[in-house]
């Protein structure tokens, strides 16, 4: 695996290493888990060259503490990527991605950008879309691999690719879960053993619920020691965000299936 630490290094690789070859791209913020690994394996199976980026994007954090406490395990991540035979790791600095500061941003006007996560985390989707556009302009992949857990993010990135005429196919992979139903997330690394017990209780409730009375469901979840930020049903999909201690977790799933593995 070749590691490109800045855009200049990456551009040299892009010109020599990827010419006339199909490129798959998996953008991450590091702290890799099996959800990322599934995306990477799919990318490798469908492309000639697989590129993974690790960049913790400061502009998509509306809470400075969340940014400061986001898990960082770069050396472990590198070992994981090497074991998966990833071709290129793009690991730029903030200065590389925002050389003149955050002067221009994508500001989504879609309804989906202003509800749920958009409402709970002002500026989050603007920062996310801005960095994704930058990464796509740099990597120029044929295929982009995303996880369904970040459902709103996926929908907005699809619109970004369409509206800016980007020649990249967006491929969405199903949410990877633990046996309890808890979705895999980098933030799970910040959960203590006591927090995990609470999370398991929450997902036991979710697996058994029929989602007809969301107020009652909210009360049940809060009784475990978790703190619900929102639970909403849109069309036939359940969206939720909750805190366990100081760790914020999000999820979504179809009403019929629940948070099944």
From Swiss-Prot:
Catalyses which reaction(s): (R)-pantoate + beta-alanine + ATP = (R)-pantothenate + AMP + diphosphate + H(+)
Binding residues annotated for ATP, in chain numbering: 29-36, 147-150, 184-187
Active-site residues, Swiss-Prot/TrEMBL: 36 (proton donor)
GO molecular function: ATP binding; pantoate-beta-alanine ligase activity
GO cellular component: cytoplasm
Chain positions recorded as beta-alanine binding sites: 60
GO BP: pantothenate biosynthetic process
Family classification: Belongs to the pantothenate synthetase family.
Protein name as it appears in the record: Pantothenate synthetase
Lineage: Bacteria, Pseudomonadati, Pseudomonadota, Gammaproteobacteria, Thiotrichales
């Amino acid at each position: 695996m070749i590691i490109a630490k800045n855009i200049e290094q990456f551009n040299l690789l892009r010109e020599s290493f990827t010419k006339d070859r199909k490129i798959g791209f998996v953008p991450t913020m590091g702290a890799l888990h099996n959800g990322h690994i599934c995306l990477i394996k799919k990318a490798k199976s469908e492309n000639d060259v697989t590129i993974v980026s690790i960049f913790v994007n400061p502009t998509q954090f509306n809470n400075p503490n969340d940014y400061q406490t986001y898990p960082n395990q770069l050396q472990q991540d590198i070992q994981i990527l090497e074991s998966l035979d990833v071709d290129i790791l793009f690991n730029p600095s903030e200065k590389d991605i925002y050389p003149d500061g955050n002067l221009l941003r994508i500001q989504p006007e879609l309804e989906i950008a202003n509800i749920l996560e958009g409402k709970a985390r002002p500026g989050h989707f603007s920062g996310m879309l801005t960095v994704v556009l930058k990464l796509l302009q740099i990597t120029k992949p044929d295929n982009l691999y995303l996880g369904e857990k970040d459902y709103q993010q996926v929908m907005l990135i699809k619109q970004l690719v369409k509206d800016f005429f980007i020649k990249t196919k967006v491929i969405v992979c199903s949410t990877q879960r633990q046996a309890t139903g808890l979705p895999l997330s980098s933030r799970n690394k910040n959960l203590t053993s006591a927090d995990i017990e609470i999370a398991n209780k929450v997902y036991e409730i979710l697996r058994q619920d029929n989602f007809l009375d969301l107020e009652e469901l909210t009360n049940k979840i809060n009784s475990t020691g978790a703190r619900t930020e929102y639970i909403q049903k849109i069309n036939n999909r359940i969206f939720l965000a909750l805190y366990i201690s100081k760790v914020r977790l999000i999820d979504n799933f179809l009403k019929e299936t629940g948070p099944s593995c």
